[in-house]
Design a protein with these regions (language model features):
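Short, surface-exposed loop/helix-turn segments at secondary-structure junctions
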Residues: 50, 99-115, 145, 163-170
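Glycine-rich, charged/polar anion/phosphate-binding loops
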Residues: 50-53, 66-67, 113-115, 133-136
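Conserved double-stranded beta-helix
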Residues: 16-81
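Single conserved hydrophobic/aromatic residue that forms the stacking wall/gate
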Residues: 1-8, 12-13
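Double-stranded beta-helix
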Residues: 72-134
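Feature marks short, surface-exposed loop/turn motifs that line or immediately flank catalytic pockets
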Residues: 37-39, 73, 88, 155-157, ...
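Non-heme Fe(II)/2-oxoglutarate
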Residues: 94, 126-128, 132-198
C-alpha cells in the first residue's frame, strides 16, 4: 500500500511529470513502478538491458524516472548508462533468476561498454532515461543499503502493450491528459530530443 501512495503523491511526481511531458507529450500513463533495494555488501549486478524489451510499447514512447531514496554512488551500485546506443532495440537474451526457473530477466549478451558513464545521485535526486537507453548496475560494496523507486511512463495515446492485459485497469492509471503546452515538444521521440545530449 505504501508504493502506490508514494508514486501518486504530488511531492514525488509533479515535477517529474513535467519533464516526462517534454519528452513524450501531454498524455502520460504510469505502466510500472517498483522499489529497488540493494542490501549492504550484496545486492548483485543487474546486467545491461533496455527497458522496452520488457514493456514493448509502440514507437518506443516510454520514459523511466529513477528516484534515489539514498545517496547512490559507484561503490553502492549506481546505474551506469551507455551513450550512443539508444537509437534501436538491441538483441536481448532471457536468463533465469534462480535454478528453479521461477523468475527471469533480460540482458544484452554482448555490448562494448568502454564508454559507459556512472549516474551518481544524491538522496532525493533522480535520473530520467529513454526506454532504449542501455543501463546496468553493479554490486553494492558498502555497509549501507541502496534504495530507489523506479517509475515507468508511456505515451497514453499508444496502444496498450501486452503486459497491461494481465493487470487490473486501475493498476496503470493515466496521470495526465491535456492539450500540449506552448514550447513542449512531445511530438518527437525521446531519442530524437536527446540525440545530441547523450
Amino acid at each position: 500500500e505504501i508504493m502506490p501512495s508514494l508514486v501518486g503523491s504530488e511531492m514525488c511526481i509533479r515535477d517529474r511529470l513535467d519533464m516526462v511531458e517534454c519528452l513524450i507529450g501531454p498524455d502520460i500513463r504510469l505502466i510500472h513502478y517498483q522499489g529497488i533495494y540493494k542490501p549492504a555488501y550484496t545486492g548483485g549486478e543487474v546486467r545491461w538491458h533496455q527497458d522496452n524489451d520488457y514493456f514493448k510499447v509502440a514507437e518506443n514512447r516510454t520514459i523511466s524516472v529513477w528516484l534515489a531514496l539514498d545517496d547512490v554512488t559507484v561503490e553502492n551500485g549506481c546505474m551506469w548508462y551507455l551513450p550512443g546506443h539508444h537509437h534501436q532495440l538491441l538483441e536481448h537474451e532471457q536468463l533465469w533468476s534462480t535454478s528453479e526457473k521461477k523468475g527471469f530477466y533480460l540482458a544484452i549478451p554482448e555490448i562494448d561498454d568502454t564508454r559507459a558513464l556512472p549516474a551518481e545521485i544524491k538522496s532525493g535526486g533522480f535520473a530520467i532515461h529513454h526506454c532504449l537507453m542501455p543501463h546496468r548496475s553493479l554490486k553494492n560494496e558498502t555497509a549501507r543499503p541502496r534504495r530507489g523507486l523506479a517509475m515507468h511512463f508511456m505515451d497514453a495515446k499508444m496502444p496498450d502493450p501486452d503486459m497491461l492485459s494481465i493487470l487490473p485497469e486501475d493498476a496503470t492509471p493515466v496521470l495526465r491528459r491535456r492539450a500540449p503546452q506552448p514550447g513542449v515538444a512531445g511530438s518527437s521521440l525521446p531519442s530524437q530530443h536527446l540525440k545530441d545530449r547523450v
